[in-house]
Amino acid sequence: MTFDGNFMLGAATSAHQVEGNNVHSDYWVQENLEHSSFLEPSNIACDHYNRYEEDIRMLKSAGLNAYRFSIEWARIEPEKGEFDENEINHYRQVIDCCKEMGVEPIVTLLHFTSPAWLIKEGGWESEKVIEYFARYTSYVIEKLGDRLAYVCTINEANMGLQLAAIAKRYEMMAKAAQNMKEPPVESGKEAEGKVQVGMNFQKMMENMKYQAAENMQAFGTPQPQTFVSARTPEGDIIVMKAHQAAKKEIKKLYPDIRVGITLSLHDLQAVEGGEKYVRDTWDEEFVHYLPYIKDDDFLGVQNYTRTVYGANGQLNPKEDAKLTQMEYEIYPQALEHVIRQVNKDFKGDIIVTENGIAITDDEIRCKFIDDALQGVKNCIDDNIPVKGYCYWSLLDNFEWQKGYSMTFGLIAVDRDTMKREEKPSLRHLGSYI
C-alpha cells in the first residue's frame, strides 16, 4: 500500500515544543513559576530554532514531502503592537528551506502558546483577542503568504472545553475524596489519559493554593486565561470568532491559500446505555463548531485514541488494554472512524494534522503507523477527500506539562548534546509514498 505523489505525507511539530527559549510566551512564564504544574521548563527544547535545516533534511531524506509546524506569536509580537522583523525573517527561512527541499510547509498560526502580554489583557476569554489575533495574522501573511498553500489558524480549538470538562470532574472527585479521607475514584493519571495533551492534574491540584498568588504577580490575575485553560462557553465562541477573523485576513491578502482549523477528536464509542453520552460529547467536540467552519477549505483532524461510554459515563480502558506513555489506549483504528464521522457533516477537504503514539518501543510505533495509514487509505478508497497525514511528532519534544518524558518522535533527541538519531519509524513512514 502506498499513496500517490499528490498526497501530503509528513510529520508535525509546534514551535514552543521544539524551538527553545520562547521567553516572551505565557507558557515560558508558567513553566518557571516556583509552584509550576510543569515537570520541568522547556529551556532550549530541541534547539529546532537553530537546527531546523538538519531536521527538515532528515524528514525529506526519509521520503516525506510535508512538514506541519507553527509560527510563534510571542516571537513575532513580543510586546503589544511591536513586531520583530528578525523573527518573521526566521520563519521565512524555515519555509524557504522546506520549499528548496521539496517539502510542503503546512503552517499553524497558533499552537497553544500566546504572548504573555495577551494574557495580561484578558487572554482567550476576552473579545479583544479576536482583533489582536487578526492583526498578528495579517502581519504574518503579508510577509509570508506568497510562500504558503496551507494555513491552520488555530490548533485544537476545542481543547479548552475538553479540559474544562475533565478538570471539573477531577476537581470534584478530589475534593470529595479529601472530605472522605479516601483517594479519588479516578487518579490523576487516569484523568490525564482522557485528554489529547500533556497535563498534570494531580500536580495542578496540589499547587492550586500557591499558584493564584504567583499568577497574580506574573499576569496580574490569579486565573490567567491561556489558550489551554478550562474554557467557558463564551470563550469557546471567542476562539471561533478569532479563527474566522484570521481567515478573513488571509483570504483578503491571498485568496488561494487553503485555510482551516484543527480539532482534537476522539473516536467515541458506546456500549449499552452510553449512546447519549456519545451524541452529547460529539456535539461538544465537533458538531457545534460546524457553523463556524463549514466554509473552510479543510479541517485538520487530530486523533490519538478512542473513548468508550457506558450507562454511567466514560469508561476506563479494559485491564488488559495496552496503553501509551500518555495513558491512552493504543487504538490506531480510531483515526479511520473519526475521519468517517467528520465526513458526514464537513464537506471540505480533510488533513490529518496530528496522529501518533508516545512509546519507547519503535516496532509498536511502526505497527501503529501501518494500521493508522490503512485506515486513511480505506477512507480515500471510499472517495473521502483526505489530502494528507502528518504524524505527531517529528522529534521527541516538550510535551507541555509532562516535560520531556513522552517520546512521540520519529527522531530521538539527546537531551545533553541535542544530537539527532533517526528511529526506524521515520523511514517506515516515508516508505508509504
Whereabouts are the PLM-identified features?
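Non-catalytic scaffold segments within catalytic domains of secreted glycoside hydrolases
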Residues: M1-I56, K60-N65, S70, I76-I433
